[in-house]
Amino acid sequence: MRIKNKNIFIIFYILIFFIYNFNLQAEEFNISAKEVLIEKDKDILIGKGLVKAKDSQGRVIEANKITYKKKIEYLIAEGDVKITDQEGNVLTTNKATYDKINENITTYGDTQFKLADGYNLAGKNISYDTLKQILRSNEKSTFTDVDGNIVE
């Protein structure tokens, strides 16, 4: 009887292990939209009309159109793009890409980056390394602090 109970426990733990590992392989983004198109042969998902994508770190990307290339974990957001992280930082632009593998967000055109603690960065074509939390741009940018001081 004890051997049978041991076997049941071993099977139970093996199942838990596989279920846990299966969840780790889940999709990188949870995407919702009014209209969703899937190109299975290219492994691409296209969302149109009030699209919202949420990644595993809780970062939320909202746009008029989102194209997600699943194989390379690359997301393209276009039209009224708003990216919010868990700390409350908000990035707004008209077009952005998110390279999930390298954890890099790149914006195209005018960009506003509002930090949760009141700081504001306005610029163009900004690259944001989300792991190191470093913003870069080769264009003229303006940084404003909470007291209204401006650095260009």
Predicted regions and their residues:
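Structural signature for solvent-exposed beta-strand/loop edge elements and short helix-capping sites
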Residues: 26-152
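Bacterial N-terminal signal peptides
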Residues: 10-21
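Bacterial N-terminal signal peptides that target proteins for export
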Residues: 2-12
